[in-house]
Amino acid sequence: MAKGKRTFQPNNRRRARVHGFRLRMRTRAGRSIVSDRRRKGRRTLTA
């Protein structure tokens, strides 16, 4: 049975534009995400 193509096609520029720090800082919800991750002690805050 055929599976189809792989759906994850890595692209660093797209990754940064969709999940990056600058994008997170744009909205109130995004800023809260970053602050939550800071409080939790995450090593990486955003993509």
UniProtKB/Swiss-Prot annotation:
InterPro entries, sorted: Ribosomal_bL34, Ribosomal_bL34_CS
A GO cellular component annotation in the UniProt record: ribonucleoprotein complex
Superkingdom of source: Bacteria
Entry-linked PROSITE patterns: RIBOSOMAL_L34 (PS00784)
GO biological process: translation
Disulfide bonds: none
Any one Pfam family match given in the protein's UniProt record, by short name: Ribosomal_L34
GO MF, any single term: structural constituent of ribosome
Keywords per UniProt: Ribonucleoprotein, Ribosomal protein
Family of the protein in this entry: Belongs to the bacterial ribosomal protein bL34 family.
Name by which UniProt lists this protein: Large ribosomal subunit protein bL34
Source organism of this protein record: Mycobacterium leprae (strain TN)
